[in-house]
From Swiss-Prot:
Interacts with HDAC7 and KAT5. This is Endothelin-1 receptor. It comes from Bos taurus. The gene is EDNRA. PROSITE patterns: G_PROTEIN_RECEP_F1_1, G_PROTEIN_RECEP_F1_2. Its main location: membrane. Residues 21-80, 133-159, 230-256, 329-347 are extracellular.
Amino acid sequence: METFWLRLSFWVALVGGVISDNPESYSTNLSIHVDSVATFHGTELSFVVTTHQPTNLALPSNGSMHNYCPQQTKITSAFKYINTVISCTIFIVGMVGNATLLRIIYQNKCMRNGPNALIASLALGDLIYVVIDLPINVFKLLAGRWPFEQNDFGVFLCKLFPFLQKSSVGITVLNLCALSVDRYRAVASWSRVQGIGIPLVTAIEIVSIWILSFILAIPEAIGFVMVPFEYKGAQHRTCMLNATSKFMEFYQDVKDWWLFGFYFCMPLVCTAIFYTLMTCEMLNRRNGSLRIALSEHLKQRREVAKTVFCLVVIFALCWFPLHLSRILKKTVYDEMDTNRCELLSFLLLMDYIGINLATMNSCINPIALYFVSKKFKNCFQSCLCCCCYQSKSLMTSVPMNGTSIQWKNHEQNNHNTERSSHKDSIN
Protein backbone atom coordinates (compact mmCIF):
# COMPACT_ATOMS: atom_id res chain seq x y z
CA MET A 1 0.00 0.00 0.00
CA GLU A 2 2.85 2.34 0.84
CA THR A 3 4.44 1.61 -2.52
CA PHE A 4 1.17 2.42 -4.28
CA TRP A 5 0.87 5.84 -2.66
CA LEU A 6 4.55 6.47 -3.33
CA ARG A 7 4.03 5.76 -7.01
CA LEU A 8 0.83 7.76 -7.17
CA SER A 9 2.25 10.88 -5.53
CA PHE A 10 5.36 10.64 -7.66
CA TRP A 11 3.70 10.62 -11.08
CA VAL A 12 1.09 13.13 -9.98
CA ALA A 13 3.90 15.51 -9.08
CA LEU A 14 5.66 14.86 -12.36
CA VAL A 15 2.58 15.94 -14.27
CA GLY A 16 2.47 19.03 -12.09
CA GLY A 17 5.99 19.84 -13.19
CA VAL A 18 5.06 19.47 -16.83
CA ILE A 19 1.94 21.59 -16.38
CA SER A 20 3.87 24.57 -15.18
CA ASP A 21 7.44 23.83 -16.33
CA ASN A 22 8.34 27.35 -15.36
CA PRO A 23 10.92 28.84 -13.00
CA GLU A 24 8.88 27.41 -10.16
CA SER A 25 8.82 23.77 -11.30
CA TYR A 26 11.03 21.02 -9.99
CA SER A 27 12.04 20.17 -13.52
CA THR A 28 14.08 23.36 -13.67
CA ASN A 29 14.73 24.35 -10.09
CA LEU A 30 15.61 21.38 -7.88
CA SER A 31 19.33 21.32 -8.33
CA ILE A 32 22.40 23.42 -8.78
CA HIS A 33 23.65 22.51 -12.24
CA VAL A 34 21.45 21.95 -15.28
CA ASP A 35 23.26 20.06 -17.99
CA SER A 36 21.44 16.86 -18.84
CA VAL A 37 18.08 15.32 -19.58
CA ALA A 38 17.18 11.93 -18.15
CA THR A 39 14.28 9.54 -17.99
CA PHE A 40 13.40 7.30 -15.09
CA HIS A 41 14.48 3.69 -15.25
CA GLY A 42 11.67 1.28 -16.00
CA THR A 43 9.10 3.98 -16.76
CA GLU A 44 6.79 4.45 -19.70
CA LEU A 45 6.43 8.19 -19.97
CA SER A 46 4.55 9.96 -22.71
CA PHE A 47 6.65 13.04 -22.08
CA VAL A 48 10.25 13.85 -21.23
CA VAL A 49 11.22 14.45 -17.63
CA THR A 50 14.02 17.00 -17.42
CA THR A 51 16.40 16.52 -14.54
CA HIS A 52 19.68 17.97 -13.40
CA GLN A 53 23.15 16.93 -12.39
CA PRO A 54 24.57 16.44 -9.85
CA THR A 55 21.18 16.45 -8.10
CA ASN A 56 18.40 15.06 -10.25
CA LEU A 57 15.06 13.83 -9.03
CA ALA A 58 16.04 10.21 -8.52
CA LEU A 59 19.65 9.78 -9.56
CA PRO A 60 22.37 10.76 -7.05
CA SER A 61 25.47 12.61 -8.08
CA ASN A 62 27.52 9.46 -8.65
CA GLY A 63 25.08 8.50 -11.40
CA SER A 64 24.80 4.85 -10.37
CA MET A 65 21.70 3.08 -11.58
CA HIS A 66 21.17 1.08 -8.40
CA ASN A 67 20.45 4.26 -6.46
CA TYR A 68 17.27 5.04 -8.34
CA CYS A 69 14.11 5.30 -6.33
CA PRO A 70 12.24 2.03 -6.87
CA GLN A 71 8.89 3.47 -7.91
CA GLN A 72 7.53 3.03 -11.41
CA THR A 73 5.59 5.85 -13.02
CA LYS A 74 2.99 5.86 -15.74
CA ILE A 75 0.91 8.83 -16.78
CA THR A 76 -2.66 8.18 -17.79
CA SER A 77 -4.37 10.24 -20.45
CA ALA A 78 -7.33 10.84 -18.16
CA PHE A 79 -5.14 12.59 -15.61
CA LYS A 80 -3.63 14.84 -18.27
CA TYR A 81 -7.06 15.86 -19.48
CA ILE A 82 -8.25 16.55 -15.94
CA ASN A 83 -5.36 18.95 -15.45
CA THR A 84 -6.05 20.46 -18.84
CA VAL A 85 -9.62 21.19 -17.73
CA ILE A 86 -8.28 22.82 -14.55
CA SER A 87 -5.89 25.01 -16.56
CA CYS A 88 -8.61 25.97 -19.03
CA THR A 89 -10.94 26.87 -16.16
CA ILE A 90 -8.28 29.11 -14.63
CA PHE A 91 -7.71 30.65 -18.07
CA ILE A 92 -11.38 31.48 -18.63
CA VAL A 93 -12.07 32.72 -15.10
CA GLY A 94 -8.85 34.71 -14.97
CA MET A 95 -9.35 36.31 -18.37
CA VAL A 96 -13.00 37.23 -17.79
CA GLY A 97 -12.53 38.30 -14.16
CA ASN A 98 -9.44 40.46 -14.62
CA ALA A 99 -10.65 41.96 -17.90
CA THR A 100 -13.98 42.84 -16.29
CA LEU A 101 -12.22 44.43 -13.33
CA LEU A 102 -10.13 46.57 -15.68
CA ARG A 103 -13.24 47.55 -17.64
CA ILE A 104 -15.11 48.58 -14.48
CA ILE A 105 -12.30 50.87 -13.36
CA TYR A 106 -11.71 52.28 -16.84
CA GLN A 107 -15.33 53.07 -17.72
CA ASN A 108 -16.23 54.78 -14.42
CA LYS A 109 -14.42 58.08 -14.02
CA CYS A 110 -15.43 58.23 -10.37
CA MET A 111 -13.35 55.10 -9.74
CA ARG A 112 -10.14 56.43 -11.24
CA ASN A 113 -8.23 57.03 -8.04
CA GLY A 114 -5.05 55.83 -6.40
CA PRO A 115 -6.13 52.54 -4.79
CA ASN A 116 -8.20 51.51 -7.79
CA ALA A 117 -5.26 52.21 -10.07
CA LEU A 118 -3.11 49.83 -8.00
CA ILE A 119 -5.84 47.17 -8.14
CA ALA A 120 -6.04 47.63 -11.92
CA SER A 121 -2.26 47.27 -12.16
CA LEU A 122 -2.46 44.02 -10.22
CA ALA A 123 -5.26 42.74 -12.47
CA LEU A 124 -3.35 43.63 -15.63
CA GLY A 125 -0.30 41.68 -14.45
CA ASP A 126 -2.46 38.63 -13.75
CA LEU A 127 -4.22 38.99 -17.10
CA ILE A 128 -0.92 38.98 -19.02
CA TYR A 129 0.16 35.78 -17.29
CA VAL A 130 -3.20 34.07 -17.86
CA VAL A 131 -3.41 34.96 -21.56
CA ILE A 132 0.20 34.12 -22.51
CA ASP A 133 1.60 31.54 -20.09
CA LEU A 134 -1.36 29.24 -19.43
CA PRO A 135 -1.90 28.31 -23.12
CA ILE A 136 1.76 27.28 -23.30
CA ASN A 137 1.28 25.11 -20.22
CA VAL A 138 -1.72 23.36 -21.77
CA PHE A 139 0.13 22.77 -25.03
CA LYS A 140 3.10 21.21 -23.23
CA LEU A 141 0.83 18.97 -21.21
CA LEU A 142 -1.08 17.63 -24.21
CA ALA A 143 1.72 17.57 -26.79
CA GLY A 144 4.47 16.44 -24.41
CA ARG A 145 6.97 18.85 -25.90
CA TRP A 146 7.95 22.50 -25.99
CA PRO A 147 6.02 24.52 -28.60
CA PHE A 148 8.00 25.38 -31.75
CA GLU A 149 11.00 23.56 -30.30
CA GLN A 150 12.80 23.33 -33.63
CA ASN A 151 12.75 26.99 -34.66
CA ASP A 152 13.67 30.42 -33.36
CA PHE A 153 10.16 31.20 -32.17
CA GLY A 154 10.48 28.37 -29.68
CA VAL A 155 13.63 30.02 -28.33
CA PHE A 156 11.74 33.30 -28.02
CA LEU A 157 8.95 31.58 -26.07
CA CYS A 158 11.55 29.92 -23.86
CA LYS A 159 12.81 33.36 -22.88
CA LEU A 160 9.39 35.02 -22.72
CA PHE A 161 7.60 32.34 -20.68
CA PRO A 162 9.67 32.49 -17.44
CA PHE A 163 10.20 36.23 -17.85
CA LEU A 164 6.46 36.98 -17.86
CA GLN A 165 5.81 34.47 -15.08
CA LYS A 166 8.31 36.11 -12.77
CA SER A 167 7.25 39.61 -13.83
CA SER A 168 3.62 38.80 -13.05
CA VAL A 169 4.51 37.61 -9.55
CA GLY A 170 6.63 40.70 -8.99
CA ILE A 171 3.81 42.99 -10.11
CA THR A 172 1.43 41.24 -7.72
CA VAL A 173 3.83 41.44 -4.78
CA LEU A 174 4.79 45.08 -5.25
CA ASN A 175 1.19 46.19 -5.84
CA LEU A 176 0.10 44.51 -2.61
CA CYS A 177 2.86 46.37 -0.78
CA ALA A 178 1.82 49.65 -2.39
CA LEU A 179 -1.83 49.05 -1.43
CA SER A 180 -0.84 48.45 2.20
CA VAL A 181 1.15 51.68 2.25
CA ASP A 182 -1.72 53.54 0.57
CA ARG A 183 -4.21 52.33 3.20
CA TYR A 184 -1.94 53.56 5.98
CA ARG A 185 -1.59 56.94 4.29
CA ALA A 186 -5.37 57.17 3.93
CA VAL A 187 -5.91 56.53 7.64
CA ALA A 188 -2.99 58.68 8.78
CA SER A 189 -4.47 61.60 6.83
CA TRP A 190 -8.02 60.72 7.85
CA SER A 191 -9.13 64.34 7.97
CA ARG A 192 -8.27 64.77 4.28
CA VAL A 193 -11.00 63.77 1.84
CA GLN A 194 -9.51 62.35 -1.33
CA GLY A 195 -10.97 63.39 -4.66
CA ILE A 196 -11.39 61.73 -8.01
CA GLY A 197 -8.34 61.08 -10.16
CA ILE A 198 -5.07 59.19 -9.92
CA PRO A 199 -2.50 61.10 -7.85
CA LEU A 200 0.88 61.69 -9.46
CA VAL A 201 2.65 59.75 -6.71
CA THR A 202 0.47 56.69 -7.41
CA ALA A 203 1.16 56.89 -11.14
CA ILE A 204 4.89 57.01 -10.40
CA GLU A 205 4.51 54.04 -8.05
CA ILE A 206 2.78 51.95 -10.72
CA VAL A 207 5.37 52.73 -13.39
CA SER A 208 8.16 51.94 -10.91
CA ILE A 209 6.48 48.66 -9.94
CA TRP A 210 6.36 47.46 -13.54
CA ILE A 211 9.90 48.55 -14.33
CA LEU A 212 11.31 46.92 -11.19
CA SER A 213 9.35 43.71 -11.84
CA PHE A 214 10.75 43.48 -15.37
CA ILE A 215 14.30 44.14 -14.15
CA LEU A 216 14.08 41.44 -11.47
CA ALA A 217 12.82 38.95 -14.08
CA ILE A 218 15.77 39.49 -16.45
CA PRO A 219 17.85 36.61 -14.96
CA GLU A 220 15.03 34.24 -15.92
CA ALA A 221 15.14 35.36 -19.54
CA ILE A 222 18.93 35.06 -19.57
CA GLY A 223 19.16 31.67 -17.88
CA PHE A 224 16.45 29.76 -19.73
CA VAL A 225 17.64 28.25 -23.02
CA MET A 226 16.64 25.48 -25.40
CA VAL A 227 18.66 22.38 -24.49
CA PRO A 228 18.98 19.56 -27.08
CA PHE A 229 18.63 15.93 -26.00
CA GLU A 230 17.88 12.49 -27.39
CA TYR A 231 14.82 10.57 -26.25
CA LYS A 232 13.77 7.17 -27.62
CA GLY A 233 16.07 7.63 -30.59
CA ALA A 234 14.63 11.02 -31.56
CA GLN A 235 16.20 14.44 -31.18
CA HIS A 236 14.29 16.97 -29.10
CA ARG A 237 14.84 20.34 -27.48
CA THR A 238 13.34 21.57 -24.24
CA CYS A 239 13.38 24.83 -22.31
CA MET A 240 15.53 24.64 -19.18
CA LEU A 241 17.39 26.88 -16.78
CA ASN A 242 21.03 26.43 -17.76
CA ALA A 243 23.58 28.33 -15.67
CA THR A 244 26.46 29.21 -17.99
CA SER A 245 28.03 32.06 -16.00
CA LYS A 246 29.09 32.60 -12.40
CA PHE A 247 26.27 35.04 -11.84
CA MET A 248 23.67 32.55 -13.10
CA GLU A 249 25.21 29.79 -10.98
CA PHE A 250 24.93 32.07 -7.95
CA TYR A 251 21.37 33.01 -8.92
CA GLN A 252 20.36 29.38 -9.30
CA ASP A 253 21.94 28.50 -5.96
CA VAL A 254 20.12 31.22 -3.97
CA LYS A 255 16.97 31.34 -6.10
CA ASP A 256 14.71 29.46 -3.68
CA TRP A 257 15.65 31.72 -0.77
CA TRP A 258 15.36 34.84 -2.94
CA LEU A 259 11.89 33.87 -4.14
CA PHE A 260 10.78 33.04 -0.61
CA GLY A 261 12.16 36.23 0.90
CA PHE A 262 11.24 38.83 -1.72
CA TYR A 263 8.25 37.33 -3.51
CA PHE A 264 6.51 35.91 -0.44
CA CYS A 265 7.74 37.26 2.90
CA MET A 266 8.13 40.88 1.85
CA PRO A 267 4.44 41.60 1.08
CA LEU A 268 3.39 39.85 4.30
CA VAL A 269 5.88 41.80 6.41
CA CYS A 270 4.94 45.06 4.66
CA THR A 271 1.25 44.44 5.28
CA ALA A 272 1.86 43.51 8.92
CA ILE A 273 3.90 46.67 9.56
CA PHE A 274 1.59 49.18 7.91
CA TYR A 275 -1.61 47.59 9.15
CA THR A 276 -0.21 47.65 12.68
CA LEU A 277 0.61 51.34 12.26
CA MET A 278 -2.85 51.91 10.80
CA THR A 279 -4.49 50.21 13.78
CA CYS A 280 -2.47 52.32 16.21
CA GLU A 281 -3.43 55.44 14.30
CA MET A 282 -7.11 54.58 14.55
CA LEU A 283 -6.88 53.83 18.27
CA ASN A 284 -5.02 57.07 18.99
CA ARG A 285 -7.68 59.11 17.19
CA ARG A 286 -10.73 57.24 18.37
CA ASN A 287 -12.06 60.39 20.09
CA GLY A 288 -12.62 63.87 18.78
CA SER A 289 -15.33 65.95 17.19
CA LEU A 290 -13.69 65.86 13.77
CA ARG A 291 -13.61 62.10 13.78
CA ILE A 292 -17.29 62.00 14.72
CA ALA A 293 -18.10 64.29 11.82
CA LEU A 294 -16.16 62.05 9.46
CA SER A 295 -17.22 58.73 11.00
CA GLU A 296 -18.87 57.52 7.78
CA HIS A 297 -15.83 58.55 5.78
CA LEU A 298 -13.53 56.61 8.11
CA LYS A 299 -15.82 53.61 7.99
CA GLN A 300 -15.46 53.56 4.22
CA ARG A 301 -11.68 53.60 4.48
CA ARG A 302 -11.74 50.75 6.99
CA GLU A 303 -13.83 48.70 4.57
CA VAL A 304 -11.28 49.28 1.83
CA ALA A 305 -8.48 48.29 4.22
CA LYS A 306 -10.30 45.02 4.91
CA THR A 307 -10.53 44.35 1.18
CA VAL A 308 -6.81 44.91 0.68
CA PHE A 309 -6.03 42.70 3.68
CA CYS A 310 -8.18 39.95 2.14
CA LEU A 311 -6.14 40.11 -1.08
CA VAL A 312 -2.92 39.72 0.90
CA VAL A 313 -4.28 36.73 2.84
CA ILE A 314 -5.37 35.02 -0.39
CA PHE A 315 -1.92 35.63 -1.87
CA ALA A 316 -0.29 34.02 1.18
CA LEU A 317 -2.57 30.97 1.09
CA CYS A 318 -2.00 30.43 -2.64
CA TRP A 319 1.78 30.69 -2.56
CA PHE A 320 2.70 29.21 0.84
CA PRO A 321 2.57 25.48 -0.15
CA LEU A 322 4.88 26.02 -3.13
CA HIS A 323 7.45 28.01 -1.17
CA LEU A 324 7.27 25.55 1.72
CA SER A 325 8.05 22.60 -0.56
CA ARG A 326 11.03 24.45 -2.04
CA ILE A 327 12.45 25.40 1.35
CA LEU A 328 12.01 21.85 2.66
CA LYS A 329 13.75 20.51 -0.43
CA LYS A 330 16.59 22.92 0.15
CA THR A 331 17.02 22.25 3.87
CA VAL A 332 15.73 18.74 4.64
CA TYR A 333 16.11 16.59 1.54
CA ASP A 334 19.36 14.60 1.31
CA GLU A 335 20.04 12.82 -1.97
CA MET A 336 22.30 10.28 -0.25
CA ASP A 337 19.73 9.30 2.37
CA THR A 338 18.47 5.74 1.86
CA ASN A 339 14.98 6.82 2.97
CA ARG A 340 14.87 9.85 0.69
CA CYS A 341 12.26 8.40 -1.69
CA GLU A 342 9.41 8.74 0.82
CA LEU A 343 10.35 12.35 1.53
CA LEU A 344 10.81 13.05 -2.17
CA SER A 345 7.35 11.75 -3.01
CA PHE A 346 5.86 13.99 -0.31
CA LEU A 347 7.76 17.05 -1.52
CA LEU A 348 6.80 16.42 -5.13
CA LEU A 349 3.14 16.05 -4.21
CA MET A 350 3.30 19.26 -2.16
CA ASP A 351 5.02 20.97 -5.07
CA TYR A 352 2.29 19.86 -7.47
CA ILE A 353 -0.41 21.21 -5.16
CA GLY A 354 1.56 24.43 -4.68
CA ILE A 355 1.99 24.97 -8.42
CA ASN A 356 -1.74 24.72 -9.02
CA LEU A 357 -2.60 26.98 -6.07
CA ALA A 358 -0.05 29.56 -7.20
CA THR A 359 -1.53 29.51 -10.69
CA MET A 360 -5.01 29.97 -9.23
CA ASN A 361 -3.85 33.21 -7.61
CA SER A 362 -3.87 34.85 -11.05
CA CYS A 363 -7.65 34.38 -11.34
CA ILE A 364 -8.88 34.42 -7.76
CA ASN A 365 -8.56 38.13 -6.91
CA PRO A 366 -11.66 39.22 -8.90
CA ILE A 367 -13.60 36.37 -7.28
CA ALA A 368 -12.45 37.46 -3.84
CA LEU A 369 -13.46 41.06 -4.51
CA TYR A 370 -16.86 39.84 -5.70
CA PHE A 371 -17.58 38.05 -2.42
CA VAL A 372 -15.80 40.37 0.01
CA SER A 373 -17.19 43.67 -1.24
CA LYS A 374 -20.82 44.35 -2.11
CA LYS A 375 -19.74 47.28 -4.23
CA PHE A 376 -17.58 45.06 -6.41
CA LYS A 377 -20.31 42.43 -6.51
CA ASN A 378 -22.84 44.91 -7.88
CA CYS A 379 -20.36 46.27 -10.40
CA PHE A 380 -19.47 42.79 -11.67
CA GLN A 381 -23.13 41.85 -11.97
CA SER A 382 -23.88 45.04 -13.86
CA CYS A 383 -20.92 44.58 -16.21
CA LEU A 384 -21.25 40.84 -16.87
CA CYS A 385 -25.04 40.75 -17.01
CA CYS A 386 -25.65 44.04 -18.80
CA CYS A 387 -28.19 42.39 -21.09
CA CYS A 388 -30.39 41.71 -18.08
CA TYR A 389 -30.48 45.42 -17.29
CA GLN A 390 -31.39 46.72 -20.75
CA SER A 391 -35.11 46.63 -20.00
CA LYS A 392 -34.62 48.77 -16.91
CA SER A 393 -34.00 52.47 -16.61
CA LEU A 394 -30.55 53.73 -17.52
CA MET A 395 -28.49 53.37 -14.37
CA THR A 396 -25.00 54.46 -13.47
CA SER A 397 -22.96 54.10 -10.32
CA VAL A 398 -21.69 56.70 -7.93
CA PRO A 399 -18.25 56.28 -6.32
CA MET A 400 -17.70 53.08 -4.43
CA ASN A 401 -17.66 54.66 -1.02
CA GLY A 402 -19.34 52.24 1.33
CA THR A 403 -19.93 48.54 1.43
CA SER A 404 -22.50 48.62 -1.35
CA ILE A 405 -23.16 50.39 -4.62
CA GLN A 406 -25.77 53.10 -4.54
CA TRP A 407 -27.59 53.17 -7.86
CA LYS A 408 -29.00 56.42 -9.18
CA ASN A 409 -31.03 57.33 -12.18
CA HIS A 410 -29.23 59.08 -14.98
CA GLU A 411 -30.66 62.47 -14.08
CA GLN A 412 -29.64 62.13 -10.44
CA ASN A 413 -26.16 61.02 -11.40
CA ASN A 414 -25.43 64.29 -13.17
CA HIS A 415 -26.11 66.13 -9.93
CA ASN A 416 -24.04 63.76 -7.81
CA THR A 417 -20.95 63.52 -10.00
CA GLU A 418 -19.46 66.79 -8.83
CA ARG A 419 -20.10 65.97 -5.16
CA SER A 420 -18.55 62.55 -5.54
CA SER A 421 -15.20 64.04 -6.46
CA HIS A 422 -14.70 64.94 -2.81
CA LYS A 423 -15.17 61.46 -1.45
CA ASP A 424 -12.80 58.57 -0.91
CA SER A 425 -13.89 55.86 -3.33
CA ILE A 426 -12.61 52.33 -3.43
CA ASN A 427 -10.72 52.70 -3.38
